[in-house]
Amino acid sequence: YCRYPISHRDLEEMLAERGISVDHTTIYRWVQCYAPEMEKRLRWFWRRGFDPSWRLDETYVKVRGKWTYLYRAVDKRGDTIDFYLSPTRSAKAAKRFLGKALRGLKHWEKPATLNTDKAPSYGAAITELKREGKLDRETAHRQVKYLNNVIEADHGKLKILIKPMRGFKTIPTAYATIKGFEVMRALRKGQARPWCLQPGIRGEVRLVERAFGIGPSALTEAMGMLNHHFAAAA
């Protein structure tokens, strides 16, 4: 569900066509339960090897008829770094988002350059994080509009996944669903490719399955692939 632009009801019908009876409310509960857990378990795999030039921006997500702000960061290649859904657009929200993106990163993994729009909230947040020692004082803050084209294009691809939802009811349910969307986007970009033993979507499926303890382990799978290769070559 989190990989494709489809509603819960449409997925219910598609499963029914294949003889599987699942109510759309059950699919909704599955997403709420497993999307955040998937994001948690796979975070180590897709949050690796970022370019030191980061692009920060926010896009709008409608929750109960009101706009909320989805803060997002990608590197200059377009790889997803992190995201954070906030009810407000403020220096406090920007700081919380950037602090989340920096959390757990080694010194050499932190950005050398941050490019944002001209919203003053980013400048205030970056200044505070530098003062607290969470961001290097040498980190450059740029406000070059065209450099953010890559993240604005990425917003559009994420919005394609969000559109069938036709709005969310609460911020927690919106955030839970978006976590699933963001993880699937990161996998489609190839950010976890080094840990996928098989090419394409099959490798991504097996990575998710292994994260939840489903199917053979990575070692067993790799040995099986080697045995198959040698048998085919014989």
Language model feature labels by segment:
Residues 1-62, 92, 96-234:
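Charged, often Cys/His-bearing segments associated with DNA-binding zinc-finger transcription factors
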Residues 63-69:
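Short, flexible loop/turn motifs enriched in small residues
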Residues 70-74, 79-89, 97:
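A short, conserved beta-strand element enriched in hydrophobic/aromatic residues
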